[in-house]
Each structure stands twice: as structure tokens, then as C-alpha cells.
Amino acid sequence: MIPWHYHTAVTDWYFCLAGILRVETRASRGDERLAVCARYQIPPKTAHRISNGGGGDCQFLPLQGIGAYDFNKVQA
């Protein structure tokens, strides 16, 4: 699991490669489960966490946009 956090200026993209990827945000969409080949965009300053959304293994590819990287922890 990637714990609750946000980025000040960087957009995150997550691509599900295997299994089911769970993307939780504190924005309007809240809780999404991605199947293989699905993607999810998280804009800057949006608190989010990433975890396995199914019973089996999960693989995903995180990509981050251009900008200074930071990892700002958020209370659960």
C-alpha cells in the first residue's frame, strides 16, 4: 500500500497491469477499483492512497508529471 499523501505540483497517473488496483482519494470520486488496462489521473493537491483492491496479486505502473517531486503525508 502507498499511504495517504498528496503532491504539491505533480499529477499522478496510475495504470493497472494485473489484478485490481484500488485508488482512494479525498475528492468527489472517492474510491475507484481499476481493472487491467484501466488508468486513473490524480491532480496536484489531491490526497490519495493506493492499494490492492482484490484477493490476488496486483501490479501497477505509477507515472508522475513534470514538476518538483514531493510526498506530503496526510493523516488517515
Predicted region positions:
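Structural motif
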Residues: 1, 20-22, 47, 57
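Double-stranded beta-helix
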Residues: 30, 49-76
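Conserved short histidine dyad/triad with adjacent acidic residue
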Residues: 1-9, 44
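Residue-level detector of conserved, well-ordered beta-strand and adjacent loop positions
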Residues: 17, 43, 51
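Short acidic-glycine-tyrosine-enriched beta hairpin
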Residues: 27-45
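Short, conserved beta-strand element in jelly-roll/cupin
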Residues: 8-23, 27, 63
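Short glycine/proline-enriched turns and hinge-like loops at secondary-structure junctions
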Residues: 7-8, 34, 53-55
